[in-house]
């Protein structure tokens, strides 16, 4: 079986009002070895002003690589979520993210189906998602980049729904990025779902959910941006680790998705102790 490592999604710094470079440097100081940057298409005010962690793909991709290299961090994936069912929004976005990932050595690009258009049927959405995924897979296959499909929205909120998206396109470039917190909040059994997708896993979002958050939203939502510190919530991380160890042949990074630097530090300590 493959090796499990712990990484951090740069969303941990969203509450700090700091730029990407700060998120990278602080992650390294906490002891992380892997990082998952988030990229966006075009320009937006907050990140341009240095108050937010995302990086424009209009920038030189080596802005990402150089910052991570200088901090001694390895990029586990790029987060490039967008609505796969809306090709005019996510088509060029995800293809550029894949090309960016290939240039800087990121092995995975994570995404999901996103919020659907209000006027389309499910059957129409499947055609649109298939189109976007097929186009993206053609770019990814040539560059040895994996596309990590995540459970996050209306169709991927169940094991059957995520598999339906996965099976739309037959490509070695397409895998699964299971988000433990999203799976839990959607009302699913995280562990049986993980067992189901473990052989196809290319990345994992290590998101824990507090009891308070669970009581408020479980079964009512399909996901959440960030969770609490790993070990503070409802997820049994020893069980998650054992499932991946026993069923996933490739190396996997558990990319922590939490809301603050303090939560990120405690998440790393908790997961490392279990590993």
Mark where each language-model region is.
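Glycine-rich, proline-tolerant flexible connector loops at the mouths of alpha/beta enzymes
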Residues: 36-63, 116-120
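Short glycine-enriched, charge-decorated loop/helix-capping segments at active-site entrances
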Residues: 49-55, 123-124, 223-229
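A structural motif
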Residues: 32, 106, 201, 249-251
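Active-site acidic/histidine proton-transfer and metal-coordination neighborhood
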Residues: 22-28, 34, 61-70, 74, ...
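C-terminal helical cap(s) of enzyme catalytic domains, especially alpha/beta-barrels
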Residues: 264-275
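A short, acidic, flexible beta-alpha connecting loop/helix-capping segment that sits on the rim
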Residues: 255-265
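Active-site-proximal loop/turn and secondary-structure-junction residues that shape catalytic pockets
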Residues: 12-14, 39-43, 81-84, 113-117, ...
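Acidic/histidine-rich catalytic cores of soluble enzymes
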Residues: 2-10, 14, 18, 22-24, ...
